[in-house]
Curated annotation (Swiss-Prot):
<feature type="transmembrane region" description="Helical">
    <location>
        <begin position="167"/>
        <end position="187"/>
    </location>
</feature>
<keyword id="KW-0812">Transmembrane</keyword>
<feature type="topological domain" description="Cytoplasmic">
    <location>
        <begin position="102"/>
        <end position="113"/>
    </location>
</feature>
<dbReference type="GO" id="GO:0071555">
    <property type="term" value="P:cell wall organization"/>
</dbReference>
<feature type="transmembrane region" description="Helical">
    <location>
        <begin position="81"/>
        <end position="101"/>
    </location>
</feature>
<feature type="topological domain" description="Extracellular">
    <location>
        <begin position="135"/>
        <end position="166"/>
    </location>
</feature>
<protein>
    <recommendedName>
        <fullName>Casparian strip membrane protein 1</fullName>
    </recommendedName>
</protein>
<comment type="subunit">
    <text>Homodimer and heterodimers.</text>
</comment>
<dbReference type="GO" id="GO:0005886">
    <property type="term" value="C:plasma membrane"/>
</dbReference>
<feature type="transmembrane region" description="Helical">
    <location>
        <begin position="114"/>
        <end position="134"/>
    </location>
</feature>
<keyword id="KW-1133">Transmembrane helix</keyword>
<feature type="topological domain" description="Cytoplasmic">
    <location>
        <begin position="1"/>
        <end position="30"/>
    </location>
</feature>
<keyword id="KW-0472">Membrane</keyword>
<comment type="similarity">
    <text>Belongs to the Casparian strip membrane proteins (CASP) family.</text>
</comment>
<dbReference type="InterPro" id="IPR006459">
    <property type="entry name" value="CASP/CASPL"/>
</dbReference>
<feature type="topological domain" description="Extracellular">
    <location>
        <begin position="52"/>
        <end position="80"/>
    </location>
</feature>
<comment type="function">
    <text>Regulates membrane-cell wall junctions and localized cell wall deposition. Required for establishment of the Casparian strip membrane domain (CSD) and the subsequent formation of Casparian strips, a cell wall modification of the root endodermis that determines an apoplastic barrier between the intraorganismal apoplasm and the extraorganismal apoplasm and prevents lateral diffusion.</text>
</comment>
Length: 192
C-alpha cells in the first residue's frame, strides 16, 4: 500500500502565472530618491551662499588712493561665521550623499536614516543660526538703526549689499531644504 497523496496543480501554476509580489521599497524608496535630489539642491544653495558672501567686496573710489572706504565680508565677524558655516553645511551634504544612496538601495534599513536625521538636525541648526545672524547685519546695512546711530551703508555700497542679501536668501533656501530632509527622514523612519 502506498502512502502518496496526489496534489493537483493550482490554476496559477498550470497557466504559468506567478503570484503578484509587492515591489520592495515602495514609497520609502521614492522618499530616498527625493532625499538624494534635495541633498544636491542643498549643496548648490549652501555652496552658492558661501561663495557669494565670500566674494562680496566693494571699495568706494572717491578720496585719494591712500584713503578709501571698503566693505568686505571679512570686516564683519558675523559674515565670517556665515561663510564658514555654509561651507561646512555644503561639505556635510556632499559627505552625506553616500548614505543617501544606501537609503535608496535599502529603503527599509533604519540605520542610515537615523544617522542622517541626527546630522541633518545639527546642520539645520547651524545653517539657521548663521543665516539669521547674517540677516540681522544685512538688515542693519540696509536700514541702519536710528537709536544706536548706526547709519545705513547700502546707499554707498550697493553692490556689497546686493551680494550679501543674495547670500542670505540662498542660505534660507538651504535651511528650507534641510527642514524638508529632516521631515522626510522622520517619515521614512515611521514603522507603519
Amino acid at each position: 500500500m502506498s502512502t502518496t497523496v496526489d496534489v493537483p496543480e493550482s490554476s496559477n501554476v498550470a497557466k504559468g502565472k506567478a503570484i503578484a509580489v509587492a515591489r520592495p521599497g515602495g514609497w520609502k524608496k521614492g522618499l530616498a530618491i527625493m532625499d538624494f535630489i534635495l541633498r544636491l539642491g542643498g549643496i548648490a544653495a549652501s555652496l552658492g551662499a558661501a561663495a557669494t558672501m565670500g566674494t562680496s567686496d566693494q571699495t568706494l573710489p572717491f578720496f585719494t588712493q591712500f584713503f578709501q572706504f571698503e566693505a568686505s565680508y571679512d570686516s564683519f565677524t558675523t559674515f565670517q561665521f556665515f561663510v564658514i558655516t555654509m561651507a561646512l553645511v555644503a561639505g556635510y551634504l556632499v559627505l552625506s550623499l553616500p548614505f543617501s544612496v544606501v537609503a535608496i538601495i535599502r529603503p527599509h534599513a533604519p540605520g542610515p536614516r537615523l544617522f542622517l536625521i541626527i546630522l541633518d538636525t545639527v546642520f539645520l541648526t547651524l545653517a539657521t543660526a548663521s543665516g539669521a545672524s547674517a540677516a540681522a547685519i544685512v538688515y542693519l546695512a540696509h536700514n541702519g538703526n536710528q537709536d544706536s546711530n548706526w547709519l545705513a551703508i547700502c546707499n554707498q555700497f550697493g553692490d556689497f549689499c546686493a551680494q550679501t542679501s543674495g547670500a542670505v536668501v540662498a542660505s534660507f533656501v538651504a535651511v528650507v531644504i534641510l527642514v524638508l530632509l529632516v521631515i522626510m527622514s522622520a517619515l521614512a523612519l515611521r514603522r507603519h
